[in-house]
Amino acid sequence: MTPSLGSFIASLFAGAFIALAIGGVLVFISQSDRVTRS
Protein backbone atom coordinates (compact mmCIF):
# COMPACT_ATOMS: atom_id res chain seq x y z
CA MET A 1 0.00 0.00 0.00
CA THR A 2 1.40 3.38 -0.97
CA PRO A 3 1.76 6.15 1.63
CA SER A 4 -0.73 8.36 -0.21
CA LEU A 5 -3.31 5.57 -0.20
CA GLY A 6 -2.69 4.96 3.49
CA SER A 7 -3.17 8.62 4.37
CA PHE A 8 -6.31 8.71 2.21
CA ILE A 9 -7.81 5.75 4.06
CA ALA A 10 -6.78 7.27 7.39
CA SER A 11 -8.50 10.54 6.48
CA LEU A 12 -11.61 8.59 5.47
CA PHE A 13 -11.70 6.87 8.86
CA ALA A 14 -11.10 10.19 10.63
CA GLY A 15 -13.92 11.86 8.68
CA ALA A 16 -16.30 8.98 9.40
CA PHE A 17 -15.42 9.10 13.10
CA ILE A 18 -16.01 12.86 13.25
CA ALA A 19 -19.32 12.49 11.39
CA LEU A 20 -20.46 9.76 13.78
CA ALA A 21 -19.41 11.84 16.79
CA ILE A 22 -21.33 14.90 15.56
CA GLY A 23 -24.35 12.72 14.72
CA GLY A 24 -24.28 11.14 18.16
CA VAL A 25 -24.13 14.54 19.85
CA LEU A 26 -27.03 15.84 17.76
CA VAL A 27 -29.14 12.77 18.57
CA PHE A 28 -28.29 13.10 22.28
CA ILE A 29 -29.23 16.79 22.29
CA SER A 30 -32.51 16.15 20.45
CA GLN A 31 -33.37 13.33 22.86
CA SER A 32 -32.66 15.31 26.03
CA ASP A 33 -34.16 18.52 24.65
CA ARG A 34 -37.52 17.06 23.69
CA VAL A 35 -39.34 18.12 26.89
CA THR A 36 -38.48 21.82 26.61
CA ARG A 37 -39.50 21.99 22.95
CA SER A 38 -42.92 20.33 23.18
From Swiss-Prot:
Gene Ontology biological process terms from the UniProt entry: photosynthesis
Annotated GO CC locations: chloroplast thylakoid membrane; photosystem II
Membrane topology per record: Single-pass membrane protein
Main location: plastid
Transmembrane segments annotated in the record for this chain: 9-29
Swiss-Prot/TrEMBL keywords: Chloroplast, Membrane, Photosynthesis, Photosystem II, Plastid, Thylakoid, Transmembrane, Transmembrane helix
Subcellular location: Plastid, Chloroplast thylakoid membrane
InterPro entries: PSII_PsbX (IPR009518), PSII_PsbX_type_1_subfam (IPR023431)
A Pfam family recorded for this sequence: PsbX
Keyword Cell wall biogenesis/degradation included in the entry's annotation: no
Keyword DNA repair among UniProt keywords: no
Assembly description: PSII is composed of 1 copy each of membrane proteins PsbA, PsbB, PsbC, PsbD, PsbE, PsbF, PsbH, PsbI, PsbJ, PsbK, PsbL, PsbM, PsbT, PsbX, PsbY, PsbZ, Psb30/Ycf12, at least 3 peripheral proteins of the oxygen-evolving complex and a large number of cofactors. It forms dimeric complexes.
Entry's family note: Belongs to the PsbX family. Type 1 subfamily.
Function in brief: Involved in the binding and/or turnover of quinones at the Q(B) site of photosystem II (PSII). PSII is a light-driven water plastoquinone oxidoreductase, using light energy to abstract electrons from H(2)O, generating a proton gradient subsequently used for ATP formation.
Protein name: Photosystem II reaction center protein X
Upper taxonomic lineage: Eukaryota, Sar, Stramenopiles, Ochrophyta, Bacillariophyta
Gene label: psbX
